[in-house]
Amino acid sequence: MFQDNPLLAQLKQQLHSQTPRAEGVVKATEKGFGFLEVDAQKSYFIPPPQMKKVMHGDRIIAVIHSEKERESAEPEELVEPFLTRFVGKVQGKNDRLAIVPDHPLLKDAIPCRAARGLNHEFKEGDWAVAEMRRHPLKGDRSFYAELTQYITFGDDHFVPWWVTLARHNLEKEAPDGVATEMLDEGLVREDLTALDFVTIDSASTEDMDDALFAKALPDDKLQLIVAIADPTAWIAEGSKLDKAAKIRAFTNYLPGFNIPMLPRELSDDLCSLRANEVRPVLACRMTLSADGTIEDNIEFFAATIESKAKLVYDQVSDWLENTGDWQPESEAIAEQVRLLAQICQRRGEWRHNHALVFKDRPDYRFILGEKGEVLDIVAEPRRIANRIVEEAMIAANICAARVLRDKLGFGIYNVHMGFDPANADALAALLKTHGLHVDAEEVLTLDGFCKLRRELDAQPTGFLDSRIRRFQSFAEISTEPGPHFGLGLEAYATWTSPIRKYGDMINHRLLKAVIKGETATRPQDEITVQMAERRRLNRMAERDVGDWLYARFLKDKAGTDTRFAAEIVDISRGGMRVRLVDNGAIAFIPAPFLHAVRDELVCSQENGTVQIKGETAYKVTDVIDVTIAEVRMETRSIIARPVA
């Protein structure tokens, strides 16, 4: 009798619409219960039985129950699952398999089976890619996944690389394909094979894509020719190799090895500017005045060169600093190094006065054994030879940005707009509390940004600089010319690494159109989206492999008295993140390690400080001594403790 009763249906509808609901993200805990985080301020308790319906990170709608002043959430509807495609470790064998996702907050094994057509017999400990197929909030009885790809066996020494590349769905090896002959591009190539071009790289570099030649001119001027490898002389637009490069967008540099954007035959041989080999190049000739200004007579042209020497960063730096026993092989090469050092000094001073110069941070290099074991991690400071190449490349990229802007009005540009306008007032208020007065409007201009950066660089510590970083916008890749506030430049377009960046290949093709006086087609915006996404994935892959290797490297230091100097990089409610100065590893110091009495401790992300009993005990950018308390291999996390 109640079956089709409209009154009953109406009552049900009313009850449903009157029941309070909330949408948010599930946060799991180690204890079995969880929370529905609605926003930064509001969260609801999810009891353990209800947590069985959801997974950490799921975005859900839940019914909110109130009992005895306590609110709790009952998951009702799945908005967006946290897991779709993931990597994990297989448990069990053959007919009864489960997979544990490789994620610090997902501990439960998910029942699974191998997808049809996947010819691998999975064993305990195997690593696999899986895709979620069932979810309790979708009306299924339980979670269920399908194994779609075998990655490798459990104790493969190279697990960090293979698992990370599979996680981010990135290629494991160089692209297939060969380039048989150079294209006829209708370019007249200037013969510069007699000039003393040199390359400066790491000793192990095979893909040399830039060579330099300098010459003194009258009136204290200097000429610089930057010659860049020319892969677009071999790879036609729209060809199979071009399409593969477009998808990869960059060479992926991971600790220990790289996965090139182009076939190795091209990147490490045909296009590589090897010593004593004739190579086609795209070149830029520029004149620098006595104060380092790039004069207006910038010239881009096609050429052939023959590098006369493969020089190594450290050897060149030692020689210029009058240490070490390396000597240039001839007076002509020595003269090149001296002139290039002069150009570097002039350009460095010009950028210091008219643009912005980054503070030098060391690069950290992993030294690996045959089986991927970490033998050592060394900090490689940026020395004079690194700066010679850097200044030459920045100058060449400024030239390309100008020429593409003035001749075509488009290109592939690196654009950085400084501070987000929405943050300008908050930024000015924060700086004011530290005694720096800036105009909220002015700081959004290139000049205003540069002025502030110089004031911050003059501060005794980097504390204030670290505080304002969160107000900055991100750098973007754009087809429109625009300023790069981070470099303090009106426009910046890279073309100096075409072997390893697809955007630089595009700029090569555009510059060649300018050289030939032809019209060119504006690059499509989709390509900038693909490049930005690939850059993000490659960076995450580099970080993930690094975390794994750092955990391996520091495992035997856990629980010992070995001290490490560590810079505080971030402070949150739960504690502090620090970077070990000698090797670059990131470690976490939990709040209880800072002070035993929780009520006397205030960790403020907002202020970048830790206060104990009202006194500032630690702040971001402080360098403190720590020991390694624990290394958790399953999550690749390093827990440190301050030395008392």
Curated annotation (Swiss-Prot):
Task: Return the SMART domains for the record.
Answer: CSP, RNB
Swiss-Prot/TrEMBL GO biological process terms? mRNA catabolic process
What top-level class of enzyme does the UniProt entry assign?
Answer: hydrolase
Q: Is Nuclease found in the keyword set?
A: yes
Q: Give residue ranges for domain S1 motif.
A: 561-643
Gene Ontology cellular component terms for the protein in this record: cytosol
Q: Its principal location?
A: cytoplasm
Reaction(s) catalysed by this chain's protein:
Exonucleolytic cleavage in the 3'- to 5'-direction to yield nucleoside 5'-phosphates
Instruction: Name all RNB domain ranges.
Output: 189-516
What Enzyme Commission number(s) appear in the record? 3.1.13.1
Q: Which UniProt keywords apply?
A: Cytoplasm, Exonuclease, Hydrolase, Nuclease, RNA-binding
Matching entries from Pfam families are given as: OB_RNB, RNB, S1
Compartments where found: Cytoplasm
Please describe what this protein does.
Answer: Involved in mRNA degradation. Hydrolyzes single-stranded polyribonucleotides processively in the 3' to 5' direction.
Tell me the protein family, please.
Belongs to the RNR ribonuclease family. RNase II subfamily.
Q: Which PANTHER family match?
A: EXORIBONUCLEASE 2 (PTHR23355:SF37), RIBONUCLEASE (PTHR23355)
The protein depicted here goes by the name Exoribonuclease 2
List the source organism.
Escherichia coli (strain SMS-3-5 / SECEC)
Lineage of the species this protein comes from: Bacteria, Pseudomonadati, Pseudomonadota, Gammaproteobacteria, Enterobacterales
